[in-house]
Amino acid sequence: MKTFQDYYPDELAHCHGCGRLNEKGLHIRTFWEGEESVTRFTPAPHHTAIPGFVNGGILASLIDCHSTGTAAAAAYRAEGRGMDTLPMHRLVTASLRVDYLKPTPLGPELVVRGRAKEIKGRKVVVESAISAGGEVTVRGEVVAVELPESMIPRAHA
């Protein structure tokens, strides 16, 4: 199954969190499961904050990249078209809020689930949550906006 990130053009696939071409990145992979977007990610030992727990910056990156991918996919879905069609929707973070509800254990697979809460013009608001072992440990909200034309490589402008 193709994930949202598979549709990012190579020129826009270098993000540390979601860029499939960033060899040292997290390589998150997001897909639809009904009306929710889902990412599954197993943190590595080098994602440690203190022994046994995931670093908060890694968790914020998961919320961030999961949510911007969800925002793009939701924009396509709202227009009734596939992610392989033009014009391209590629959204970036305008605002990121992360609430750490409890320490997130290192070891189990983390599941990130999200929903587009609002789609209005160039802006999509996404709510996401991370759970470990079925327990929500982090909640977040991202306001994502269409990538400014000045940042789009010429081949895709």
Task: Show where each model-derived region lies.
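Non-catalytic linker/capping segments at the edges of enzyme domains
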Residues: 1-50
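Hydrophobic beta-strand-centered segment that forms part of the acyl-chain substrate-binding groove
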Residues: 70-111
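A generic structural signal for short beta-strands and their flanking turns/coil linkers
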Residues: 11, 26, 35-37, 56, ...
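A conserved, well-ordered hydrophobic junction motif at loop->secondary-structure transitions
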Residues: 38-74
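HotDog/MaoC-like acyl-thioester-processing domains
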Residues: 1-10, 102-157
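Hydrophobic residues in beta-strands and at strand termini
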Residues: 41-43, 100, 146
